[in-house]
Amino acid sequence: KVTANYNNGDLDRTTHDSILSVGSIESEGTTYIEGKNYTSEAGRVTGKNTIIDVKENITIGSLTLKGDDKFGSDNDNNETYQLTRKAGSEVSGTDSVILNAGNNINVKGSMVGSDGTVQLTAENINILNEKESERKELKNKSGNILSNSSLEEKSYRESAVGSTIIGSNVILDAKNDINIKASNVIAIKGDGENPGGNIIATAGNNINILAETLDNSYSRKEKSSGFSTNFASGGGGFTAGVSYSTNSLEQTRNGTTVAISTLMSEGSTLL
């Protein structure tokens, strides 16, 4: 990950993360990884048969990329834009993907997939989402001796980046718990005598299929004030007057959305 910075003062600055290169392990045969732990952030592992076998934890996660922009003329007239994005990892095998961990398998905002069987075996299996966010803020103020106006607008929005486990057969085998949150487990039938399309999930304790709550908010404040002149005639006379008025408008909305989990098979689903 590299970060590009431009800073010409608080009202003229930008910072953005980007991925310069992605770590990759690839083979046309079997890709076999063995060790104490396996951790990936925006990495890629592929092969015909991909096997990761560790004593403790497998973590297939994402890399956080941030952006922050602010520009304007002064503290009353400017715009701010901030965002957070997630770049996930990938573990794939054309014929199969086998993940074995002595403790936990954690897949977060990433993909594990094969045209054949995908099998995860561990104490706990966690297939989870990541969150992305976007924040905007606008300030505008103008006026003169006779009138003034101001505007302040803010918004915030979250979105889910779910994990996906996909294969012709998907097997999840946990001694304790299986947790699936705002993510997808998909089994698609292939060709041949045993096309698959089955999901088999077994746990010693609980299988939890959960949703993720996402926050969003919006606020807008407008104010204006100023002098105005009024003219009237009647009864053979003519009158003129000056009045002063103020107006304000304030809107606020806060809400939540829900990102759900999906288990979809073209064959059988056994929990």
Each predicted region: which residue ranges?
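Binding/recognition "hotspot" determinant
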Residues: 1-270
